[in-house]
A protein has these predicted regions:
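Domain-level signal for soluble alpha/beta catalytic cores
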Residues: 1-140
Length: 140
């Protein structure tokens, strides 16, 4: 079922926080949670599955801070690819009978736009577009 069709006749339940759960699992202060998609994939996948099992229809990838200002192009591609794969594994493993969708979680760049900051609007658009393109290759 397409998400748009699901919205017409259902109440949508979303997942909850990822960062706080990763901290409970050992994420250290200052450590990027996005790296856990690669280094602790089973932990991230288990968190996603727990949300699906609890009845969430939409689970977000662990990519809130994943952007080209924080990570190299190679890192960003690996992180987002792994993040999408982790949620897909969780979706496949969950058998609660609910419809299950995946959302690409995109947070702020961490920079202010001009004139308050130094980031050009067009550069910000490209930063977000790159993240979306990488997420889209994962066929969310």
């Amino acid at each position: 079922m397409h998400f748009r069709d699901f919205l017409k006749s259902n109440i949508v339940c979303l997942d909850g926080g990822m960062g706080t759960l990763l901290q409970a699992k050992g994420l250290c202060p200052g450590e990027y949670p996005e790296y856990w998609n690669l280094t602790h994939a089973d932990t991230v996948t288990a968190i996603h599955q727990s949300y699906y099992d609890a009845g969430s229809n939409v689970v977000s990838t662990n990519t809130f801070g994943a952007n080209s200002l924080k990570f190299s192009d190679t890192e960003l591609e690996s992180i987002i690819g792994a993040a999408v794969a982790n949620v897909k594994r969780a979706r496949a493993a969950s058998h609660n009978g609910e419809e299950k969708f995946i959302a690409l979680d995109i947070g702020p760049t961490g920079k202010l736009l001009k004139p308050l900051g130094e980031l050009d609007f067009t550069d910000a658009v490209e930063i977000f577009a790159k993240t979306v393109r990488l997420g889209d290759t994962g066929s969310i």
